[in-house]
């Protein structure tokens, strides 16, 4: 059952709401415009608030639904977390879009919401505070994601290895943003 759910989570994660909504509304492909990222922040830049919110909600659900299904099927918390990681990997490397996806932050937040809501709340609060202070989405993601690890280590240690793996993937996907942050070239809102 684990492997079936993991594959289905990857396939669900491969649905890129940013790309699909852009195509449906005649907006530019977010991978080719703005920051080049197929995610909610770039959709805000390219297509406005409404499509950005729809992208955010779709990406959150891609992480949340597989975890909830795995939980309902009685899988262990660690298996639920790995299935959530598969959904995020689908978002990062979508089968349907030549393996060029987003950075996985919203999908990871959905996964966390399903696994351990207090960790998701911590991540969202850290993201919002960092974004409010810096107006930089990438920095907010790079701060919020690792902040969940100590809480998970303390409260839900079974989710720590999958979440640590996920954190490394998200930081890796932000490597260009890290270069730009250190060089003082990162885009602000």
From Swiss-Prot:
GO terms for cellular component: plasma membrane
Enzyme class of the recorded protein, top EC level: transferase
Known catalytic reactions: an acyl phosphate + sn-glycerol 3-phosphate = a 1-acyl-sn-glycero-3-phosphate + phosphate
Chain segments annotated as transmembrane: 1-21, 51-71, 77-97, 111-131, 151-171
Subcellular compartments: Cell inner membrane
InterPro entries: G3P_acylTferase_PlsY
Keywords assigned: Cell inner membrane, Cell membrane, Lipid biosynthesis, Lipid metabolism, Membrane, Phospholipid biosynthesis, Phospholipid metabolism, Transferase, Transmembrane, Transmembrane helix
Membrane topology: Multi-pass membrane protein
Pfam families: G3P_acyltransf (PF02660)
Biological process, per Gene Ontology: phospholipid biosynthetic process
GO molecular function annotations of the record: acyl-phosphate glycerol-3-phosphate acyltransferase activity
EC number, UniProt record: 2.3.1.275
UniProt pathway annotation: Lipid metabolism; phospholipid metabolism
Subunit-structure text: Probably interacts with PlsX.
Cited function: Catalyzes the transfer of an acyl group from acyl-phosphate (acyl-PO(4)) to glycerol-3-phosphate (G3P) to form lysophosphatidic acid (LPA). This enzyme utilizes acyl-phosphate as fatty acyl donor, but not acyl-CoA or acyl-ACP.
Similarity comment: Belongs to the PlsY family.
NCBIfam families from the UniProt entry: glycerol-3-phosphate 1-O-acyltransferase PlsY (TIGR00023)
Protein name from the UniProt record: Glycerol-3-phosphate acyltransferase
Record organism: Pseudomonas fluorescens (strain Pf0-1)
């Amino acid at each position: 059952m684990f492997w079936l759910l993991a594959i289905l989570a990857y396939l669900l994660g491969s649905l890129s709401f940013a790309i699909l909504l852009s195509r449906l509304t005649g907006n530019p492909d977010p991978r080719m415009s703005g920051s080049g990222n197929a995610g909610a922040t770039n959709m805000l830049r390219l297509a406005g608030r409404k499509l950005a919110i729809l992208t955010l909600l779709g990406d959150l659900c891609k992480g949340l639904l597989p975890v909830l299904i795995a939980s309902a099927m009685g899988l262990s918390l660690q298996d639920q977390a790995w299935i959530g990681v598969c959904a995020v990997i689908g978002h990062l490397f979508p089968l349907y879009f030549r393996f060029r996806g987003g950075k996985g932050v919203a999908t990871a937040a959905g996964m966390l919401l399903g696994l351990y809501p207090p960790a998701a709340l911590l991540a969202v609060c850290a993201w919002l505070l960092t974004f409010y202070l810096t107006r930089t989405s990438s920095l907010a993601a790079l701060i919020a994601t690792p902040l969940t690890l100590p809480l998970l280590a303390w409260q839900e240690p079974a989710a720590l290895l999958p979440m640590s793996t996920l954190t490394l993937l998200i930081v890796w996907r932000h490597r260009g943003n890290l270069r730009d942050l250190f060089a003082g070239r990162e885009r602000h809102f």
